Amino acid sequence: MTDHSVDRYFITSRKLGILMISDLEKYDSQKMYKIYDDWPKIARESYESEQELIDFQNIDHIVFAGMGGSGAIVDLFSSILSKSDIHVSLIKGYLLPKTVDKNTLVIITSVSGNTDETLTVLNSAKKIKCNVIAFSSGGKMEKFCYNNKITFRKIPKFHSPRTSLINFTYTILKILNSILPIEKKDIMDSLSELDRIKKEIDSNNLSDSNPAINLAKWLSNIPIIYYPHGLEPVATRFKSSLQENAKTHVITEDVIESCHNGIVSWERSSEVQPILLQGKDDYIKTKERFTIIKKFFIKNNIDFKEVNSVSGNILTKTISLMYLLDYTTIYHAVLSKIDPSPVNAIDFIKKEISENN
């Protein structure tokens, strides 16, 4: 029987070769890994940077809008605020909810500033009597906001939208400090945790003690990521990063919902690899489902891996897991001799959209 005992993140995987810094230099053409080496530093500098703070009054509804790498940012904020008293809506598309009114704050995020869906939402928000703030590195969004007197904050892009999650997140936390019900202690705890896990997972530790490398080596086929509701943004981010960086197909399933349908697919032999993404403080019934699913996998000789969050607040859990799993996708890409940076298919889609507009 396979040993499925868990350390802080997940069990040590089988060895599939040695990853060396020369491999990262060879296959990571735009040196994405170096940005991740600096993620904790970028996060801290972003939060401590001088920013013109914003205070909107009488807000009882926050709408986050963003796609792709920017969408991961709004997913993260939606998760952070999930237990607050503020009504939170998430837009991944073109349309604002009809519940938007004068007490709504619409937060628009597009790292590039040129995202078609997000620009459409921004234009719609302009026509409604609601509060709006937009964040981007420039692009069409900056010009639109300037021409229409919409509150705008420019945040630099690091490498690509997906790698810029870290500085956008902590800059927004700083700028919207008076609006977002997030304790400063929670933010500082998250920064400390990033500093801590960097030593385990960055490119200065390419040994078998690196949990991101171990998971990257274990992955050899299509992964299916089982997640609890509170960690859905982490699962979605992991899926997206595997798709963009490692150019691989990925499946995600809510662990509770999967017990009513998805689990049946394991009655057929499959090369799909299950990853169980778990929170330290998951609801007791959720923990029970994970235990049952693990029992089912072991009984049926299905190899799986577990990824557990650290203890702490939701920001610390989500950002540290995203850090770990983003690194996993880079290492997996390089081990597969794939350049993690280019996204040629996305470039094709953007070109087609631009030509059709």
Predicted regions and their residues:
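Short, small/acidic-rich helices and loops at N termini and domain boundaries
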Residues: 339-357
